[in-house]
Amino acid sequence: MWKHVSQVLADQFGAYYSIKHKEKIHTGEMHEAWIIDDGIQPVFLKVNDKTFRSMFRAEADQLLLLAKTNTINVPNVYTVGCSHTHSFLLLEALPLDKTNPVDAMGKFGEQLAKLHLIKGADNYGLDFDTWLGPEYQPNGWKENWATFFSEQRIGWQLQICREKNLVFGDIEVLVKKVAELLAKHKPQPALLHGNLWIENCATVKQEIFTYDPACYWGDRECDLAFSELFEPFPRQFYESYDRTYPIDEGYPERKAIYQLYYLLNFSHRFNKHYVELTKKFIHDILSR
């Protein structure tokens, strides 16, 4: 694999590129991650077996899609490659600082609002499917937001949970309830990061960069809801966002519904206390 990576990098940066140093920095839920360099140009490498090529291709396409908006900062994409045994994604290696200063987060709120203000779709979905963490995320286009979110987000995650022997009651009942609660809400489709929480943000030279997206065109409130779920962003982020693109007064009523999608995902991935929290959210939603 390393020989193939070296050849791809030589094609990308010029024949002079030769890997002189490599350091494994993370073996996460799915992929290995490395920093490799030739002494001049460091590169971030995600690697897995060759069956993951489509996942890496989707991640690259999402980062390119976000980069084209000239709003939020994302790593540059170099290429997606595949050897006989492995697939990999090569990205810009950034000196990430996880402190995320308040001033930088305030500016990030404005940048995210500008992303959400872009009009590029009439319906909800994306031209290709993506992943939320290790789980497939279907993005088939729908004209109706309530149908899209209830079926392709809540219903989909509930089905994955059930396949992993994690049952949260009758799937059809909850999907119907979510559709009912969202029935009158017809948001302008916004391009979403889709996986926006503090773990996917870091600072580079006083600018917030974000990564690991799960993009689609949907309700902008989904990004805001996940950002508030576990470790909310600083107050300045939301104030800056609201100044640039005022938050709808009905958002508090929908926030828990959108957060449920991520809680279901975390429940079947990590279990632990997420299951009990998810049960509480479901109970509260069904009680409305």
UniProtKB/Swiss-Prot annotation:
Give the enzyme's EC designation.
2.7.1.-
Key word Transferase present = yes
Which residues take part in binding ATP? 92-94
Q: Name one Pfam family in it.
A: Fructosamin_kin
Q: Which UniProt keywords apply?
A: ATP-binding, Kinase, Nucleotide-binding, Transferase
UniProt-listed InterPro entries: Fructo-/Ketosamine-3-kinase, Kinase-like_dom_sf
Keyword Signal included in the entry's annotation: no
The Swiss-Prot or TrEMBL record annotates one GO molecular function as:
kinase activity
Domain of life where this protein originates: Bacteria
The protein's job, in short, is: Ketoamine kinase that phosphorylates ketoamines on the third carbon of the sugar moiety to generate ketoamine 3-phosphate.
Q: Which family does it belong to?
A: Belongs to the fructosamine kinase family.
Full protein name: Probable ketoamine kinase PM0587
Write down the species.
Answer: Pasteurella multocida (strain Pm70)
